[in-house]
Amino acid sequence: MKIALLSEKYTPDIGGLAISTERLARLLPSAGHHVYVLCPSPNLLPSEKRTLTSNGVSVTRFGTRKRVDDTLVDWFEIIVEEHRRAPFDVLHAYFLTQAGFVATYAGKYLNVPSVVSIRGNDIERAAFDPARFSHTLYALQNASVVTTNASELVKKAKAFFDRDIILIPNGIDTDHFKPLEQISRLLQTMRLIPPEASGLPSYFGMKQTSPFQLTVGFVGELREKKGLKVLLPAFAQVNQKRPTTLLIVGVVRQGEDKQFFDEFFTLHPNLQIFVTGFISPGDLPHYYSLMDVFVHPSLRDGLPNAVLEAMACERPVVATPVGGVLDVVKDSENGLIVPANDAESLSNAILKLLEDQPLRNRLGKAARETIQKEFTLQKELDLNLKLYKTLRLKD
């Protein structure tokens, strides 16, 4: 089959949307399908279009315009042009709003089945945004199939418009995301880590006041939605009882979030907080293995890739019961669940794990077993292929 994947973000863009779209694009050619990714890019001029093909995936990026509606028109016209050159069998959009609307409308126009995948923010916020409401409703009403990666998002989508929603959880490559104990011990016990000894990028270096100081980690773009204003106060509370390092693998979002972070750091200059900047997905397992505790204190979410990756790396996880987190993290079985927006509960859970190595080990091993059984790449691929085949038979 010839499958078009529409997404507002795609590798090397950062974020869960880019990661998830790229993951499916990479899996489909292994099953014999032809994949065409169509993605807007603010780094290209309006009307500029570039196509790169690698490993069976053709990625076409086109320049965005000042007006969103003009960008959507371009997106639609590119789909029509590509379809007339060599017809698509399925149009699959990642994200309910812009990509979902364009895929659904183009699918109706071209008589091609459309799949719209809800990822999190698209349904969490679009329902309250007048500018996106009509596109969201149109996609939900008219897409051939709607999927999502979290059971909580199924409920929210059905509340928006009552129709069948198919649950397809994210999959994780457990051969790549796995515990790397030797590197973890090396990096945690050295006061200054030489890049040549770690095998990590040259800008990664970490000083510790004690070789026995433990590390709490977060992965992703730290911002208010991801619990920035909860994590930092909780970390300060932890340090009142036990000196600890906070390792942020990723970036802090610019603007108000960065201002809050800088002001917090000014008020707490003695806290050990390290921000790595963007890290290639290929290097992430090394960084997960640095963490004695992984935290994901989101206020809203889909099914966070970072939580699944950390669990696959046998990290004990502390997370909040939002989005699809409860689909994977079972409190006290393979991780700890704390209320969202509650710094005291978060700090208590972190301390509980820092002070109990057997508990950390037990939860970490159970976490990896959960991923290996229920959140595999093969399962994600099989569910999508089953969906495509059903649509093709109906068509």
What are these regions (language model features)?
Residues 140, 278-279, 286-291:
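Short alpha-helical donor nucleotide-sugar binding micro-motif in glycosyltransferases
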